[in-house]
Amino acid sequence: MRIHVVDHPLVAHKLTTLRDKRTDSPTFRRLADELVTLLAYEATRDVRTELVDIETPVTPTTGVKLSHPRPLVVPILRAGLGMLDGMVRLLPTAEVGFLGMIRNEETLKAETYATRMPEDLSGRQVYVLDPMLATGGTLVAAIRELIERGADDVTAVVLLAAPEGVEVMERELAGTPVTVVTASVDERLNENGYIVPGLGDAGDRMYGTAE
């Protein structure tokens, strides 16, 4: 597993505004969308391409296009939905799947409650969207399901990560073809499982349900 923290002044600027508790939901959604597009630029650096012959108004030439099978973008419901537009803006021809995950309050493990994606992901590049990598449990469970379906190249795009979550990912997904792209690895998790300094509950702030 590999983690890539995107170092760019626009990423830092937008992330700072997202962190600010005074930022309202409409602004939060817009900035999250913009930030995802910046992260997606880095996340797709190794997207698979193939050569194609074309003809410009001047002369024939050779260019590149995205290879088949198409990349698959999978937001984790619900907060991952708020990242979808920012990702497919760069990959408009990508296929979109959905994965619903919820924590079992008895086992404290993430469980799947809804899926909408191909059964066979062999040879597919998959981009998973989830705003926060906190404890890592949800993202590990989601990526394992994708790998079980045959995905051989998975990139997780997250706005923020906690070192505890990164450690869990590195331990549980050691040796797997997984990359995490994020705007920041923050200091720690607090006793309530929130990333510090973080930005609060991304889903609540996106959808206007934060107190």
Curated annotation (Swiss-Prot):
Q: Which CDD domains match?
A: PRTases_typeI (cd06223)
Report activity regulation: Allosterically activated by GTP.
Sequence positions that bind 5-phospho-alpha-D-ribose 1-diphosphate? R78, R103, D130, P131, M132, L133, A134, T135, G136, G137, T138, D201
Q: Which GO terms describe its biological process?
A: UMP salvage; uracil salvage
Q: Which cofactor does it need?
A: Mg(2+)
Q: Which cysteines are joined by disulfide bonds?
A: none
Might you give the EC number(s) for this enzyme? 2.4.2.9
List the GO molecular function terms. Answer: GTP binding; magnesium ion binding; uracil phosphoribosyltransferase activity
Q: Kindly state which keywords UniProt assigns to this record, in alphabetical order.
A: Allosteric enzyme, Glycosyltransferase, GTP-binding, Magnesium, Nucleotide-binding, Transferase
Q: In which pathway does it act?
A: Pyrimidine metabolism; UMP biosynthesis via salvage pathway; UMP from uracil: step 1/1
Against SUPFAM superfamilies, the record matches this protein to: PRTase-like
Task: Show the InterPro entries listed in the entry.
Answer: PRibTrfase_dom, PRTase-like, Upp_B, UPRTase/APRTase, Ura_phspho_trans
The reaction(s) annotated as catalysed by this protein in its Swiss-Prot or TrEMBL entry are: UMP + diphosphate = 5-phospho-alpha-D-ribose 1-diphosphate + uracil
The note on the cofactor says: Binds 1 Mg(2+) ion per subunit. The magnesium is bound as Mg-PRPP.
**What are the binding positions for uracil in this chain?**
I195, G200, D201, A202
Q: Pfam families in the record, alphabetically? A: UPRTase
**Family, similarity comment:** Belongs to the UPRTase family.
**Primary role:** Catalyzes the conversion of uracil and 5-phospho-alpha-D-ribose 1-diphosphate (PRPP) to UMP and diphosphate.
Q: What is this protein called?
A: Uracil phosphoribosyltransferase
Organism listed in the record: Streptomyces griseus subsp. griseus (strain JCM 4626 / CBS 651.72 / NBRC 13350 / KCC S-0626 / ISP 5235)
